[in-house]
Amino acid sequence: MPVFTIRTNVCRDSVPDTLLSDLTKQLAKATGKPAEYIAIHIVPDQIMSFGDSTDPCAVCSLCSIGKIGGPQNKSYTKLLCDILTKQLNIPANRVYINYYDLNAANVGWNGSTFA
């Protein structure tokens, strides 16, 4: 059930139509979780600054039941920053990604929880 959220000051018109699908496929491969459970949420057109500059930037989060931790997070960060640089022209040094390892009992889906 990984959920990847991107909040960015990049305008909606500059977000490629393929970004959702590309992120889903890459995160499924990286996490080993089925693509059917991966959710992507892109919030463009935000009023943001990073380092006192309003150049393109992003603040992201990846939430998952498991598959979150030190070495994995480094791998995810490289993967996700590469995608954001390639598809949204956001340099990797203008991206923050917060990681959250969720308890299965605290995640609801399809009328129940994952616990």
UniProtKB/Swiss-Prot annotation:
Ubiquitous. Detected throughout embryogenesis. Detected in adult spleen, liver, kidney, heart, brain, intestine, testis and lung. It holds the Pfam family MIF. It is found in: Secreted; Cytoplasm. GO terms for biological process: inflammatory response; innate immune response. Keywords: Cytokine, Cytoplasm, Immunity, Inflammatory response, Innate immunity, Isomerase, Secreted. The active site is at 2 (proton acceptor). It catalyses: 3-phenylpyruvate = enol-phenylpyruvate; L-dopachrome = 5,6-dihydroxyindole-2-carboxylate. Substrate binds at residues 33, 65, 98. One of its GO terms (molecular function) is dopachrome isomerase activity. Transmembrane segments: none annotated. GO terms for cellular component: cytoplasm; extracellular space. Its EC number is 5.3.2.1, 5.3.3.12. PANTHER family: D-DOPACHROME DECARBOXYLASE, MACROPHAGE MIGRATION INHIBITORY FACTOR. Belongs to the MIF family. Homotrimer. Pro-inflammatory cytokine. Involved in the innate immune response to bacterial pathogens. The expression of MIF at sites of inflammation suggests a role as mediator in regulating the function of macrophages in host defense. Has phenylpyruvate tautomerase and dopachrome tautomerase activity (in vitro), but the physiological substrate is not known. It is not clear whether the tautomerase activity has any physiological relevance, and whether it is important for cytokine activity. Required for normal neural development during embryogenesis. This is Macrophage migration inhibitory factor.
